[in-house]
Amino acid sequence: MAGKSSNGDGVKFADDAGSGNSIDGIAIIDPGTVTSASGGSGSDAGSGDSGNTPRKRGRPAGSGTGAKRGRPAGNSAAKKVPGNLGVEKILFSLHLMASSALKVEELALDEKEAEALAGAVQEVASHYDITPDPKIMAWAGLFGVCASIYGPRVAAYKMRAAAEKRDKKEAAKPMAQKVQEAKPTEHDPAAPYIEQLPVSNTL
Protein backbone atom coordinates (compact mmCIF):
# COMPACT_ATOMS: atom_id res chain seq x y z
CA MET A 1 0.00 0.00 0.00
CA ALA A 2 1.35 3.40 -0.94
CA GLY A 3 2.15 5.83 1.88
CA LYS A 4 2.33 9.62 1.88
CA SER A 5 5.19 11.89 2.83
CA SER A 6 5.52 15.65 2.87
CA ASN A 7 8.32 18.12 2.32
CA GLY A 8 8.96 21.44 4.02
CA ASP A 9 6.53 23.28 1.75
CA GLY A 10 3.53 21.34 2.98
CA VAL A 11 3.15 19.35 -0.28
CA LYS A 12 2.36 15.72 0.26
CA PHE A 13 3.74 13.03 -1.95
CA ALA A 14 2.22 9.62 -2.47
CA ASP A 15 5.04 7.07 -2.20
CA ASP A 16 4.85 4.25 -4.65
CA ALA A 17 6.25 1.45 -2.55
CA GLY A 18 5.79 -1.13 -5.22
CA SER A 19 7.25 0.68 -8.15
CA GLY A 20 10.86 0.64 -7.03
CA ASN A 21 11.76 3.41 -9.47
CA SER A 22 14.74 5.36 -8.21
CA ILE A 23 17.91 6.91 -9.47
CA ASP A 24 20.94 6.86 -7.24
CA GLY A 25 18.73 6.22 -4.25
CA ILE A 26 16.38 9.10 -5.05
CA ALA A 27 12.82 8.02 -5.58
CA ILE A 28 11.17 9.07 -8.82
CA ILE A 29 7.83 10.72 -8.07
CA ASP A 30 4.93 10.57 -10.47
CA PRO A 31 3.41 14.09 -10.81
CA GLY A 32 -0.06 12.56 -10.90
CA THR A 33 0.37 11.33 -7.33
CA VAL A 34 1.14 14.79 -5.90
CA THR A 35 -1.66 16.14 -3.62
CA SER A 36 -2.03 19.54 -2.00
CA ALA A 37 -1.83 20.07 1.72
CA SER A 38 -5.60 20.66 1.88
CA GLY A 39 -6.29 17.03 1.13
CA GLY A 40 -7.47 17.30 -2.49
CA SER A 41 -6.63 14.59 -4.98
CA GLY A 42 -3.97 14.98 -7.61
CA SER A 43 -6.49 14.77 -10.42
CA ASP A 44 -8.35 17.81 -9.05
CA ALA A 45 -5.21 19.92 -9.19
CA GLY A 46 -5.72 20.29 -12.90
CA SER A 47 -4.23 17.58 -15.10
CA GLY A 48 -3.55 17.99 -18.76
CA ASP A 49 -6.13 15.32 -19.65
CA SER A 50 -9.12 17.23 -18.26
CA GLY A 51 -9.07 19.86 -20.99
CA ASN A 52 -10.51 22.51 -18.64
CA THR A 53 -8.82 25.85 -18.16
CA PRO A 54 -7.80 26.66 -14.57
CA ARG A 55 -10.44 28.59 -12.67
CA LYS A 56 -9.53 32.16 -11.87
CA ARG A 57 -9.94 33.62 -8.44
CA GLY A 58 -12.66 36.15 -7.63
CA ARG A 59 -16.32 36.54 -8.53
CA PRO A 60 -17.35 35.50 -12.04
CA ALA A 61 -18.19 38.33 -14.37
CA GLY A 62 -21.86 39.26 -14.32
CA SER A 63 -22.71 37.13 -11.26
CA GLY A 64 -22.48 39.93 -8.71
CA THR A 65 -25.43 41.70 -7.17
CA GLY A 66 -23.74 45.08 -7.11
CA ALA A 67 -25.09 48.10 -8.99
CA LYS A 68 -24.39 48.14 -12.69
CA ARG A 69 -22.42 50.87 -14.29
CA GLY A 70 -24.26 53.77 -15.85
CA ARG A 71 -27.27 55.68 -14.60
CA PRO A 72 -29.00 54.32 -11.50
CA ALA A 73 -32.20 52.40 -12.03
CA GLY A 74 -34.21 55.08 -10.26
CA ASN A 75 -33.13 57.74 -12.77
CA SER A 76 -33.46 55.67 -15.94
CA ALA A 77 -36.93 57.05 -16.54
CA ALA A 78 -38.81 60.10 -15.38
CA LYS A 79 -40.79 59.61 -12.22
CA LYS A 80 -44.45 59.23 -12.88
CA VAL A 81 -46.94 61.54 -11.23
CA PRO A 82 -49.61 59.69 -9.25
CA GLY A 83 -52.93 59.62 -11.03
CA ASN A 84 -55.20 60.58 -8.16
CA LEU A 85 -54.09 64.03 -7.03
CA GLY A 86 -57.45 65.78 -6.85
CA VAL A 87 -56.40 68.11 -9.66
CA GLU A 88 -59.89 68.15 -11.15
CA LYS A 89 -61.39 69.38 -7.86
CA ILE A 90 -58.79 72.14 -7.64
CA LEU A 91 -59.43 73.25 -11.21
CA PHE A 92 -63.20 73.09 -10.69
CA SER A 93 -63.03 75.26 -7.56
CA LEU A 94 -60.59 77.77 -9.09
CA HIS A 95 -62.80 78.34 -12.12
CA LEU A 96 -65.86 78.59 -9.92
CA MET A 97 -64.27 81.26 -7.73
CA ALA A 98 -62.97 83.12 -10.78
CA SER A 99 -66.42 83.18 -12.34
CA SER A 100 -67.91 84.46 -9.09
CA ALA A 101 -65.24 87.13 -8.54
CA LEU A 102 -65.27 88.38 -12.14
CA LYS A 103 -69.04 87.95 -12.48
CA VAL A 104 -68.56 85.88 -15.62
CA GLU A 105 -70.67 82.75 -15.40
CA GLU A 106 -69.09 81.28 -18.55
CA LEU A 107 -65.79 80.70 -16.73
CA ALA A 108 -67.27 78.03 -14.47
CA LEU A 109 -66.52 74.41 -15.42
CA ASP A 110 -68.71 71.38 -15.01
CA GLU A 111 -67.40 68.08 -13.67
CA LYS A 112 -66.65 66.55 -17.09
CA GLU A 113 -64.72 69.60 -18.25
CA ALA A 114 -62.71 69.69 -15.01
CA GLU A 115 -61.93 65.97 -15.34
CA ALA A 116 -60.77 66.36 -18.95
CA LEU A 117 -58.59 69.35 -18.10
CA ALA A 118 -57.08 67.52 -15.11
CA GLY A 119 -56.24 64.51 -17.29
CA ALA A 120 -54.43 66.72 -19.78
CA VAL A 121 -52.45 68.41 -16.99
CA GLN A 122 -51.39 65.07 -15.50
CA GLU A 123 -50.41 63.73 -18.93
CA VAL A 124 -48.04 66.67 -19.45
CA ALA A 125 -46.65 66.35 -15.90
CA SER A 126 -45.91 62.64 -16.41
CA HIS A 127 -43.20 63.50 -18.96
CA TYR A 128 -41.17 65.48 -16.42
CA ASP A 129 -39.17 64.44 -13.37
CA ILE A 130 -41.75 65.68 -10.88
CA THR A 131 -42.44 64.23 -7.44
CA PRO A 132 -45.27 66.16 -5.76
CA ASP A 133 -45.09 66.56 -2.01
CA PRO A 134 -47.93 64.49 -0.48
CA LYS A 135 -48.56 67.13 2.19
CA ILE A 136 -48.93 69.92 -0.35
CA MET A 137 -51.23 67.82 -2.50
CA ALA A 138 -53.33 66.90 0.56
CA TRP A 139 -53.77 70.57 1.50
CA ALA A 140 -54.55 71.45 -2.11
CA GLY A 141 -57.15 68.68 -2.23
CA LEU A 142 -58.74 69.93 1.00
CA PHE A 143 -58.80 73.47 -0.37
CA GLY A 144 -60.42 72.26 -3.56
CA VAL A 145 -63.12 70.30 -1.74
CA CYS A 146 -63.93 73.22 0.56
CA ALA A 147 -64.08 75.60 -2.38
CA SER A 148 -66.35 73.27 -4.33
CA ILE A 149 -68.70 72.98 -1.32
CA TYR A 150 -68.77 76.56 -0.05
CA GLY A 151 -68.08 78.38 -3.32
CA PRO A 152 -71.56 77.85 -4.81
CA ARG A 153 -73.16 78.80 -1.49
CA VAL A 154 -71.24 82.07 -1.30
CA ALA A 155 -72.12 82.87 -4.90
CA ALA A 156 -75.80 82.07 -4.28
CA TYR A 157 -75.83 84.29 -1.19
CA LYS A 158 -74.34 87.20 -3.12
CA MET A 159 -76.88 86.78 -5.89
CA ARG A 160 -79.76 86.64 -3.41
CA ALA A 161 -78.53 89.72 -1.53
CA ALA A 162 -78.20 91.65 -4.78
CA ALA A 163 -81.70 90.61 -5.85
CA GLU A 164 -83.20 91.68 -2.51
CA LYS A 165 -81.48 95.05 -2.72
CA ARG A 166 -82.75 95.57 -6.23
CA ASP A 167 -86.30 94.64 -5.20
CA LYS A 168 -86.22 97.14 -2.36
CA LYS A 169 -85.18 99.90 -4.73
CA GLU A 170 -87.97 99.00 -7.15
CA ALA A 171 -90.54 99.00 -4.35
CA ALA A 172 -89.38 102.41 -3.08
CA LYS A 173 -89.78 104.17 -6.46
CA PRO A 174 -93.65 104.23 -6.57
CA MET A 175 -93.83 105.55 -3.02
CA ALA A 176 -91.49 108.41 -3.91
CA GLN A 177 -93.55 109.24 -6.98
CA LYS A 178 -96.80 109.32 -4.98
CA VAL A 179 -95.32 111.62 -2.36
CA GLN A 180 -94.04 113.95 -5.05
CA GLU A 181 -97.43 114.11 -6.79
CA ALA A 182 -99.38 114.79 -3.57
CA LYS A 183 -97.12 117.63 -2.46
CA PRO A 184 -99.10 120.97 -2.38
CA THR A 185 -97.91 123.99 -4.30
CA GLU A 186 -96.22 126.64 -2.23
CA HIS A 187 -96.64 130.44 -2.63
CA ASP A 188 -93.62 132.24 -3.87
CA PRO A 189 -92.87 135.03 -1.41
CA ALA A 190 -91.11 137.06 -4.10
CA ALA A 191 -94.23 137.25 -6.27
CA PRO A 192 -96.46 140.33 -5.72
CA TYR A 193 -99.51 139.66 -3.68
CA ILE A 194 -102.54 141.85 -4.45
CA GLU A 195 -105.49 141.65 -2.22
CA GLN A 196 -108.72 142.29 -3.98
CA LEU A 197 -111.00 144.54 -1.95
CA PRO A 198 -114.74 144.75 -2.47
CA VAL A 199 -115.65 147.68 -4.72
CA SER A 200 -118.60 149.82 -3.67
CA ASN A 201 -120.96 150.97 -6.38
CA THR A 202 -122.18 153.87 -4.38
CA LEU A 203 -120.33 157.15 -4.51
Curated annotation (Swiss-Prot):
Encoding gene per record: X
Biased composition (Basic and acidic residues): 180-189
Protein task: Assembly protein. The major coat protein P3 and two assembly factors (P10 and P17) are needed during the assembly of the virus particle inside the host cell, when the capsid protein multimers are capable of enclosing the host-derived membrane, containing the virus-encoded membrane-associated proteins.
Keywords: Viral capsid assembly, Viral release from host cell
Gly residues bias locations: 39-49
Region (Disordered): 1-80, 166-203
Top-rank taxon: Viruses
Protein name: Protein P10
